[in-house]
Amino acid sequence: DPKDKVLKPKYYIWYDLSPNGKKIYDWASGNAGFKLSNYDGKPEIYPTVPMDDGNGPEGGKYGKYVKLTTSDTGAWGVIVNRRLAAGNLFIGVFDPMPALTNTLLCTRFGLPFSKKPLRLTGYYKYKPGEKLQDKNGKPIEGKIDRGTIYAVMYRNHDANGNAIVLNGNDVKTNPNIVALAD
């Protein structure tokens, strides 16, 4: 695939396969943002990685799974005050360009749909991190980290007909949201 040859990322990029076997890049993760702090790191240390170690759903009966980990961004993260990178996987696009000015604008959630979804099924396990910290890296005593899973359906044009895309700032609060499962 030409896109694979141009990007040559050192992290995992997620995609679906079309009926004729072509890659459809409709999934995104923040791995491109983590690359800013981990230029030469191996793909396995990124926040969002595939796993096939027998620990998946029902003892590995269903094969591979995605491991999402909150990762330390090291010295670079301390300097720019972006100390953590959360593992995530979503339908949409991740653009690392605003990472230093407004991290929440990096995520652009969603793709157009034309049918009403009936259900979303899946399996997950969650293990909280050892400590919860504030944006300055100081531990928050007495609180435990929480993972989140949510689905959002929204109108992709505002009342004036302008195209919109939700991002990390408004993914759960935008007035164009028509359904939210959290």
List the model feature ranges, each with a label.
Residues 1-119, 142-154, 160-182:
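Aromatic (Trp/Tyr/Phe) and Gly/Pro-enriched flexible surface segments
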Residues 121-125:
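Short edge beta-strand/loop segments characteristic of extracellular beta-sandwich folds
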Residues 126-133, 139-144, 157-160:
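Extended, low-complexity, turn-rich repeat/linker tracts enriched in Gly/Pro/Ser/Thr and Asp/Glu
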